[in-house]
Amino acid sequence: MSAPDTVSPLDLRFSAAELAERRDRIQSFIRDTVAAAGAERCVLGLSGGIDSTTVAHLTVDELGADALHGLVMPGAVSRDQNMSDAERVAEDLGIEYDVVEIDPFVTQLTDVFPDAAGDEVAVGNARARTRAVINYFVANHGDGVVLGTGNRAEAMTGYYTKYGDQAVDCNPIGNLYKMQVRQLARDLGVPEDLVTKAPTAELWADQTDAGELGVDYDTIDAVLAVHVDGGLPASATATHLDIDPSVVETVRDLYGASKHKRAMPPAP
């Protein structure tokens, strides 16, 4: 399933020179992070989506295939196509990878707490946190660093599991809007079917990012760039982007409600 075509309210793509500079900066960041940690390699969860695929390409391009260990971690709600895509990415790049089923871990929880078995959010977040545990188990055993796959749109809207998919050592594409991730992915040679695939966290059945967030990523990017990062008032943002004010409010509310995810745990 591909992401629906949308007309972006704002073009945030880089110029050719800016794209080359940003790609070089990210790849140098990956190299420097690994060196600073004194690590031997990187560990990356592969979902078959654009974000993890882009990070995989960046890492292999900079450090070589031997420096990256991929983990494909399917669960009961994972689409077969996504898992096949994840394995295809690993094989195309020539990296070592393992497939680890996460349901046996999650089932241990629902067996002990059966009343929670029907709680989509609790079980879905447990899936994300289980993947984080597996990432770090492999990284600790192999003297590696865990690479994150989060982008700026996800970070600023809180569209991730706390201590789950953002439990990582670094986020190579963390300062890129989703539109920019797509642009970088194409520049890296990521297959077009992965670039245009509808994003999903696959925390529960038939979940899509746009369906859960209520706004498509191009619009989220635009509101974040103009209103949250740019500081333009909400009403002026709606006028500038020619979108309904309620859309700006939705993105602003997502940003506000997720501030706790972007902060260290409070202490008295």
UniProtKB/Swiss-Prot annotation:
ATP binds at G45, L46, S47, G48, G49, I50, D51, S52, T149, K178, T200. Pathway: Cofactor biosynthesis; NAD(+) biosynthesis; NAD(+) from deamido-NAD(+) (ammonia route): step 1/1. Keywords: ATP-binding, Ligase, Magnesium, Metal-binding, NAD, Nucleotide-binding. Deamido-NAD(+) binds at R129, K162, D169, H260, K261. Its EC number is 6.3.1.5. The keyword Iron does not apply. GO terms for cellular component: cytoplasm. It comes from the Archaea. The keyword Nucleotide-binding applies. Mg(2+) binds at D51, E154. InterPro entries: NAD/GMP_synthase, NAD_synthase, NH(3)-dep_NAD(+)_synth, Rossmann-like_a/b/a_fold. It holds the Pfam family NAD_synthase. Catalyzes the ATP-dependent amidation of deamido-NAD to form NAD. Uses ammonia as a nitrogen source. Homodimer. This is NH(3)-dependent NAD(+) synthetase. The gene is nadE.
